[in-house]
Amino acid sequence: MQNFLPYPDFAASARVLDQARLGKQRVETLQTLRALVIPDYGWVRHPAIRMWMGYVPALTAYGLAVVSEWVSRGHADSTYRQILEFAPEVLDDPHVPLPPWFGEPGLHLSHRSNLIQKAPEVYRERFPGTPEDLPYSWPEPAEECVAAEPAGRRLWVWRSPDPFEEAADILLPPTSPGGSAGPKWGRQLRAFEETVQDGDAVAVLAADRDHLRTGHLGPVLMHEDGLLRPVRPHGVLSRSEVHPPALLQDPRTFFGVDLPPVLVR
């Protein structure tokens, strides 16, 4: 988990990266954004994550600059849309607030130094006169901003194991789709059984990425394969109605987001 900022300029930082690191930066930026925005995602104690707390639009702008440079070199990309979902507003106003550490000479120097440590044959020539033994500079955030579960009315989201099936029921087995019965899966089961209220809104993530099938959840029932709740179909929800849409990148099978205004009744 590391974003490289050898210069106090997103585009210039992307341009100076070699092919391997530039490609990986797209994925690492996406992972960092998810750790900042998606509850229970993990990694929130990592200093490279913490330094961006409170500045998701700025990190989104950095990620888009990296993608732009990657594509300009002739490569295919699948991350642009996912990164943009964290702060769609940056397209209309790219001059987003920047972290207070952005522009501090010592921080950018430390990133140049660590790039040399990773690939001296590439970066020694690009950053002449740079010390080659500096540790990373990871400033602490002015305020800790850890993604939390919604506090008010929720839209429950279910990631269907069969995206092409029109499910009338939601079934959560004792173990996760990966076969684990760990703490994270246990929290999903408890939410499904105890937190959900009869009649709560639900949306199903299925084959159509841009639209979610919506409905209302019925009472929890015991099933031979786990816990089950019937769904009363209601309609269709545009992905863009969830704010931010990136919350739907949550890898969990069952989770909640703030109830979109269009569903408030």
Spans of features found by a protein language model:
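Expand to "…catalyze enediolate/carbanion chemistry for C-C bond making/breaking, isomerization
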Residues: M1-P150
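Compositionally biased, charged N-terminal/linker segments
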Residues: V146-E194, R265
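Short, surface-exposed, polar/charged, turn-prone segments marking secondary-structure boundaries
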Residues: V71, T79-Y80, G179-A181, D258-L259
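Structured alpha/beta reader/binder surfaces that contact nucleic acids or chromatin modification marks
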Residues: A58, L171-H243
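Residue-level recognition of well-ordered secondary-structure positions
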Residues: L30, R50, I116, G152-R154, ...
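Contiguous surface segments at macromolecular interaction interfaces
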Residues: E149-E166, E224-R265
